[in-house]
């Protein structure tokens, strides 16, 4: 589905660079067309040196401001134009404004640091999907996770129908040979002169069409960025500092690079820009700098960028040495990840837009097709073009319900599955949506929120704090390789101890055990959901008990302490269901949490609310601070103080570091609760279908 058309009358920002970026370029900063490679490197080194000097000055200002916060309440934030200095282009002082609610176990945090320092993508993926990556470490952890993500190693994106149709129309209009039979082609090839003439004409036509499409895409990207700036400041005439302009240039060119590489499969869409903008809220577009986009969650004093650490200063201050460690990661580290922003962005899009290969394409590949993933824009589009309706034949519906959780599906199939599950799990809200016609115009602008939720994984529509945690889950998604045993994965996790694994818990979407659960009598031969449950339990579970039967040598036993015979199985949680199917249940869980609010709104208000879902984890903390201010308390006096150091006999198991105010008695992790509730909704749905299918 294509996003709404951008008005061509919006003025463009003059600062944007219009130079086309070659696909082979790996530089973040956009060079001029006439520059040589050596000049590019020198310019980049000079910029990095200047940035390091400027950052040192900025750090001193931040430290001074932090000291002032302990004794004085900050009256107001500086106006955006006054927070930009000439040299650096931007000055971000940590404010005493609202902080996102965030709690994280210290033991798991230290384990995450260990995995990050060693570039252990197995361990990072485990923590990401189970507990989430600490937000201020995402700028280093996400590139590592994306580099080894299964959807990046074996990418497939559902082709856009419009791209396929345009290509077919171009081919048919340029040469009749594209639709002719093999005998016609043989007859045509006898006339070499006619063939060369037609070939040259076709090539020129393709080149002109490609140039026009590229120019149109570049103009659309610029206009969409202009709208984003207007969204932040409320005006197109805002004079942006040089740093902000440079960051936007990097984002713009990252999207250009992606469209140049993947344009034969998917056309440019507003969602592609929003993915880059949302990524830039956690990963600095400029290398060795801390500057990220603020996003929409903090708009009381509009500004475009801030320090990636600003939102979590309370947490960082509570762990000795963490501030220095993070500064080292930002300014000096080249070991963990050196991917450019556009490289991280491309990998992120491949994950968010991933779709399983159609069976027809798999069969073609098995029969000797040499087409790569970039050639998937074939005539398979007839399998997708008619899925914009909710009604399917019973056989197809059964296939979706039993296979979709494992294999995933197209966006049309996922939307249909979402509607089906919503009616099963939240019948009252589903009926209200039906009465208000909230879900009756799929594919139209009225229900655009649903596409932003399911197809684009919360891009634009969700708060950056909630979306960041959900993206952690998706980037950490990993299946167990059935050819690998427990010892292989246990070694990859650096022999993590039993207590830590228990703390990480089972997979959020763990599956019912059909053999041990009491259930009504049913015919096992006709129960397709019994087969699904059995498959999920067999394929995605690995425990220490399974491996103990395979131990043969003393050397392997020496590395793993033998458990007691009555000890519980040591389990490494692997992903159970497709991440985009898991996203469906996360979306249902989000709707459930907002049900009381939604039933009080009309059609227009519901769509507006769901298109810009507020973050409870952020607003709760904000309301808490407002209450303190109304009572006459100084917010600086309730800053989260450093926790008492543990005694020698006290373990890390009881230490939870918080980013919240010290007197906040009702600490919440809203989005973690939503994800856990999504697992409950998944099991509830699976059990219902398991029984009904009997």
UniProtKB/Swiss-Prot annotation:
InterPro entries given in the database record: Rab-GAP_TBC_sf
PANTHER family: RGPR-RELATED, SECRETORY 16, ISOFORM I
Presence of the UniProt keyword Cytoplasm in the record: yes
Species for this entry: Lodderomyces elongisporus (strain ATCC 11503 / CBS 2605 / JCM 1781 / NBRC 1676 / NRRL YB-4239)
Subcellular location: Cytoplasm
Similarity-based family: Belongs to the OCA5 family.
Domain Rab-GAP TBC: 407-685
Listed GO CC annotations: endoplasmic reticulum exit site; ER to Golgi transport vesicle membrane
Basic residues bias (residue ranges): 382-394
Record field: compositional bias (Low complexity): 32-47, 172-199, 635-646
Keywords: Cytoplasm
Source organism superkingdom: Eukaryota
GO biological process, one term: Golgi organization
Chief localisation class: cytoplasm
Name under which the protein is recorded: Oxidant-induced cell-cycle arrest protein 5
Chain residue ranges for the region called Disordered: 24-47, 61-94, 164-216, 359-399, 626-647
